[in-house]
């Protein structure tokens, strides 16, 4: 069972992940977001759907590459506080290091991008 301090850190990291995903979506023109977060003792899932977004195939490919990086607990412990603190194109770099599984679905015709993120607790 998670201790209170551990839950606090878990919640803070979840908020950082959501913030980074939102920043990415706003950067590419999203006008409306739907966010669903579910946390239990085993995992946290984040489902974010962005509407009115326009990204190129290159950005989509790059996003997949960044998110597919293996989770790195040591880097996460050190760097998670850095997310959201600069204007560099790093939104998804830290997200990739902090998650265990993901999927991205993009409907170009409708301008809808969906992230499904899983993080084992």
Regions found by a protein language model. Give the residues of each.
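Glycine-rich ATP-binding loops of the HATPase_c
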Residues: 100-106
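Beta-strand residues in well-ordered beta-sheet regions across diverse protein folds
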Residues: 47-49, 105, 114-116
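Glycine-rich/acidic phosphate-handling loop/turn and adjacent ATP-lid/helix
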Residues: 46-92, 120
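Conserved ATP-binding N-box helix of the HATPase_c
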Residues: 8-38, 89-98
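Conserved beta-strand core positions
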Residues: 31-33, 44, 102, 113
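Short C-terminal beta-strand
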Residues: 110-120
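N-terminal presequence-like segments and adjacent domain-start helices
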Residues: 1-9
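Short, well-structured hydrophobic secondary-structure segments
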Residues: 33-49
